[in-house]
Amino acid sequence: MSDQQLDCALDLMRRLPPQQIEKNLSDLIDLVPSLCEDLLSSVDQPLKIARDKVVGKDYLLCDYNRDGDSYRSPWSNKYDPPLEDGAMPSARLRKLEVEANNAFDQYRDLYFEGGVSSVYLWDLDHGFAGVILIKKAGDGSKKIKGCWDSIHVVEVQEKSSGRTAHYKLTSTVMLWLQTNKSGSGTMNLGGSLTRQMEKDETVSDCSPHIANIGRLVEDMENKIRSTLNEIYFGKTKDIVNGLRSLDAIPDNHKFKQLQRELSQVLTQRQVYIQPDN
């Protein structure tokens, strides 16, 4: 029964607005407390921003940089609140983490023109894993509010030869938009999308791990953007157009009247030219 309850709860969460995930998740846990751990580990939540007081830069919070009640900054590698024995990446991986944060900071600035990004890496037995986080919130300056949260979890299995690696990428994007205009009123639109891909890539000085991961993330985000734009927003536009005419009502009546008159004329012509039996 618990498996069925979990499946139903996850299916429900997928259909609810992403800007209300925390409230909806809390309500579900109150209804079924036994699902608390499974829901918290399975449902992606909107990313929160914190400030690194050491270097004066923002970073994103998630389960992957949390140890107890403290969160590790990718910039200073310090926990806040301070934690003496918090989990840390190895020296080799920390160096790679610093380079990855700098690379994706440029990627975020190029594609999103703002926002916050963070990269966290951790060691595995035969390689390493990491998460790339990007958050961009709209300021409502054009009467449009919204937020984009992308969470890319990558697992890297390094082959024994050291020349190739297997990459497994799981990406989740949460997006919501709210418009408030005098002509169209208020409209809310939101949802989340998860996609996964696996690929083998060559690892060399010309194509290091960061470049390979960067290409995978870039390709995945482009595909998700395209899916959101063409399918979700396209479908919404079709539905709205079906419910609400863009033309003025008098013009619409005139057009329909013209259609009826043309139809009558064509019908009369068909009757007129029909040969006698």
UniProtKB/Swiss-Prot annotation:
InterPro entries: CapZ_alpha/beta, CapZ_alpha/beta_2, CAPZB, CAPZB_N, F-actin_capping_bsu_CS. Transmembrane segments: none annotated. Gene3D superfamilies: 1.20.58.570, Capz alpha-1 subunit, F-actin capping protein, beta subunit. The modification N-acetylserine is found at S2. SUPFAM superfamilies: Subunits of heterodimeric actin filament capping protein Capz (SSF90096). F-actin-capping proteins bind in a Ca(2+)-independent manner to the fast growing ends of actin filaments (barbed end) thereby blocking the exchange of subunits at these ends. Unlike other capping proteins (such as gelsolin and severin), these proteins do not sever actin filaments. Plays a role in the regulation of cell morphology and cytoskeletal organization. Forms, with CAPZB, the barbed end of the fast growing ends of actin filaments in the dynactin complex and stabilizes dynactin structure. The modification N6-acetyllysine is found at K235. Its main location: cytoplasm. Keywords: Acetylation, Actin capping, Actin-binding, Cytoplasm, Cytoskeleton, Phosphoprotein. It holds the Pfam family F_actin_cap_B. This is F-actin-capping protein subunit beta. It comes from Mus musculus.
